[in-house]
């Protein structure tokens, strides 16, 4: 659902009122067609009378058009007013008059009321207005926190889409109501606006009102501008003293924005006072009207009244009132008050499958449930005894009361034992619940020592394996560590939101009350209320409170049971219930799950050894510790493992960066630098070694290619020389006595006819004249050298030109006056040089400080761990039961015939085969769902918010811009337009799951299609909504003979299975170094894409050239240079100027990035600047004010292989060839080229001469 309304209107019934004039309107007389003198005099007279009337009106108010006669009353004698509470009656009267005057609506309020008459509707809950819905554009909007339905038949039927991000519900307006809708606008100049209670001030992006002008119940009211357009919808407010800041939903140009001041409260009206019923009469739940409603006076009637009101909102007020018997006096709240509810309950005896000796029994300490939702490993155990209250219903934390037959006995709390594979440490106890910290184990046992010193125990199968908190599996809490969020059971006995169901206990059979006496059966009640049913004779059925005798009867013919409905007991599946309808009560339980922080250890820092593009970590864990790492490029290459012993791990570190996470320590990010062996400005083998370390494949390819070219050139040259000599000498060799001309002889090295061979000649010269020998040898060498140096000089002249041509082929970033493109990389400085005729150049510097990619989310549902609710079974003795349909998730109900259950006192029923048991079960959200649940969202278009720092001249400002589209902002009086981003990339899929502070890209099933044992087996919109869906494969089974229980089978929780198999969160493996955050879900600082920027700088941002220093004789000298290092170069600008001042400095190429943006200059001096480059031989132009100089440097590779910061320069440099390397290439290629050219010339000349013959 798009929460930006569409401006669709068919006409408005309201138009803004024209501005009021400060003078009364007078009827203008009609001028005569032919003016005359008398008419002019009459006109002057009328004007004078009007002026006189206006002066009188300024002194006294005008009379109404139809004055009403006032009734004259006799003046009453003045009496001294009586003082009441320090105030007189006159003061009270004045206060009332002031209140009446204050309630009169002002101009702004009246104007809003006219508009609101059509476009807003009340939202009502149980007949009371809780807020408002507003018609804006083509949509009806209602705050999501306002409970109730819209008080309009057409609008109440609409299907609303809910957005938790904006706290808003939205639906399309019916077509016939669009004429009632208000316009809206995103234009919000600072000033005053209107709403129902008067003026609203808008300043600094916040709406504020005087404190007291708004109140709960105003949620959903619109704020209008002076044209009647909606600019915002009120959600709540935050009291800030004399003024209240409003929490609103408003509109920007292309998106919806929610403004929530700190401390804001929702302004939905509080619900009405909860009412309860008694005998078809209603009353406030906290004020029962009858004396018998006091539990101490009539226990059973009071419990029945509570059962009748168990589902009403004021149930707990009624429970408190009935138990404390409020009589107008105030009761002190104390710890014992928390135990007061337990006087209406009692412990019980239930079936236990293992009573500690391998056999089953009916145990007074039967274990009902074990909860382990706390992440700190704490267990919350529920059993059938009660702790902290004695058998007299008094609070005593040293006692445990348990059921011993029909009686209640006390045990000492110190005898309580809880154990798994070892003894547990008990942290807290109250009522039916125990908090304990236990070692891992496969069973759980609870035991006490009764009054006869016998051990009463119950053991159940339970797998306890607490998971670690954080990234280290430790056992002992450290003295020093790191605090991280976790959950635990809060050790408090105060009332909580968690509750358990109670019900009336069943009639308990007890054969010990029967005795045989001379053919008669005697029933000994012992002060109890007993039901009896004997088949001997007639009429032997009833209830008695005293001993009685059944004549002529046997014990086997009688069935007696004790009935006691003065106390509730827990709704246990191991004890039958007394009533067939699902009557129940509820009580709060202690020890709620709470969000806290847990101290966890921090693994010892690893020993880090930096290598070339890799890092070696020596890990020394004290306990199993999680180690993970990822790269920060497009492919994260995530890896994780649990380390249990000292190991060594080597991790590759690319230029894009790497992040490793060791235990609970903070993640560490590292970047590699372009380090290598050799020298870029040394001998050829050193240069080859240098480039082989940086680009091994390219270097090998280049060297092999150049070698092949050299060999081919040499072989080709030799072949041409041999061919030329052959062509030259062949004709003369075939002609006897022919003489070879001396020119051909020189070219072809042809021997004379009378001369010896070359070897003989050279040997002769060596023996006879060595000086001539060396001259003969030096001549051709000299020729070759002369040709080589000539070619070298030609190449040197073209060197700079060819280098610049190649450099222009690379990626460069140039800044123009009104548009540029900056990289979307946090911390990367981007600078542009702006020139304007008549002004000194201006350096514009921009840097992305922070980015936030926030998708638009639509909550599909939440899922969490379920709990299976198994009410006490209903056993119908001597009859049949029937299941009824109930609107419960995954509800199951079955009736089993032929049951014959036993309780601790004997058979529950008197019949043998006509008994039936009604078993039912359903699924509900676990109590832990409030703290531990996963939310399934559908993600739509994401908005990218960037915080950009802009600096130019004297302006240094940081702005927030949305770069999905065009976003215009004003910085220092200059309009900048940012966006749209070059890449629409997002790390989020269209379906994501959010669990605590982790985000997962996961394809989850839609609402209503969950599968048992999988993610989404239970689904609901919120953790408290009534739209719970469940599919857990719950199936009931037939109870075992002779036992009272409700067996069932069910697929384990899909949520808990998902927690084990959920995999790695997007937080740790997001590409491009994204940092995933929640509340709201967003990706921070993703280094992807470029941001176009357009600007329109005024002339005032520049310095006139006549006012700026004039730089002359600017020269650049590079002192030191280390490439591929963060500002590892230092250069010095030497200059002369006509006056002192400030000059902007800038590098006009992406080959180098300057650290400084401005420099102070004097009449003569030097300026030292720092630069960063990735080139070994950078050559770049630096400007100081309007003067420019070329800087050339010979850079050395960095010494540090790994650094903890990213490079501040562009790594894309082409060609990255040092000047020395180019010189050696030119020398080698020049020599080979000269040799090849000489061979070509010889071949050409010989060929030409041969053709002339």
From Swiss-Prot:
Keyword Zinc included in the entry's annotation: no
Outcome when changing residue 1188 to K: In strain: A7 and MTV
Reported impact of residue 890 to A: Shifts the pH threshold for fusion to a more acidic range
Motif, Nuclear localization signal: chain positions: 64-105
Impact reported for residue 903 to L: No effect on E1 fusion activity
Resulting phenotype, residue 755 to F: Complete loss of p62 precursor-6K cleavage
Record has Protease as a keyword: yes
Region (Ribosome-binding): 105-119
Consequence the record notes for mutating residue 1165 to R: In strain: MTV
Record EC number: 3.4.21.90
Pfam families (alphabetical): Alpha_E1_glycop, Alpha_E2_glycop, Alpha_E3_glycop, Peptidase_S3
Protein name (database record): Structural polyprotein
